[in-house]
């Protein structure tokens, strides 16, 4: 599972608790997407970004350049 390259968010281990109180191990996975990001120097790079960083404006999605043909 990928980590967010902006904030370092990664999967964490926890427990699922049933109504009867039984506990089972589980993994909480962050909502991470691989997308094209424009860096401050203007270059475009593919990186893993969590949606919280995307909504907060910590990264800017790279503009799409239509193919000519």
Curated annotation (Swiss-Prot):
<keyword id="KW-0689">Ribosomal protein</keyword>
<comment type="similarity">
    <text>Belongs to the bacterial ribosomal protein bL28 family.</text>
</comment>
<dbReference type="GO" id="GO:1990904">
    <property type="term" value="C:ribonucleoprotein complex"/>
</dbReference>
<dbReference type="GO" id="GO:0006412">
    <property type="term" value="P:translation"/>
</dbReference>
<dbReference type="InterPro" id="IPR050096">
    <property type="entry name" value="Bacterial_rp_bL28"/>
</dbReference>
<keyword id="KW-0687">Ribonucleoprotein</keyword>
<dbReference type="InterPro" id="IPR037147">
    <property type="entry name" value="Ribosomal_bL28_sf"/>
</dbReference>
<dbReference type="Pfam" id="PF00830">
    <property type="entry name" value="Ribosomal_L28"/>
</dbReference>
<dbReference type="GO" id="GO:0003735">
    <property type="term" value="F:structural constituent of ribosome"/>
</dbReference>
<dbReference type="InterPro" id="IPR026569">
    <property type="entry name" value="Ribosomal_bL28"/>
</dbReference>
<protein>
    <recommendedName>
        <fullName>Large ribosomal subunit protein bL28</fullName>
    </recommendedName>
</protein>
<dbReference type="InterPro" id="IPR001383">
    <property type="entry name" value="Ribosomal_bL28_bact-type"/>
</dbReference>
<dbReference type="InterPro" id="IPR034704">
    <property type="entry name" value="Ribosomal_bL28/bL31-like_sf"/>
</dbReference>
<dbReference type="GO" id="GO:0005840">
    <property type="term" value="C:ribosome"/>
</dbReference>
């Amino acid at each position: 599972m990928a980590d967010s390259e902006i904030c370092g968010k990664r999967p964490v281990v926890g427990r699922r608790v049933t109504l009867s109180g039984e506990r089972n191990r589980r993994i909480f996975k962050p909502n991470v997407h691989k997308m094209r990001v424009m860096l401050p120097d203007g270059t475009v790079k593919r990186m893993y970004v969590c949606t919280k960083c995307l909504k907060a404006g910590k990264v800017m999605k790279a503009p799409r350049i239509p193919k000519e043909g």
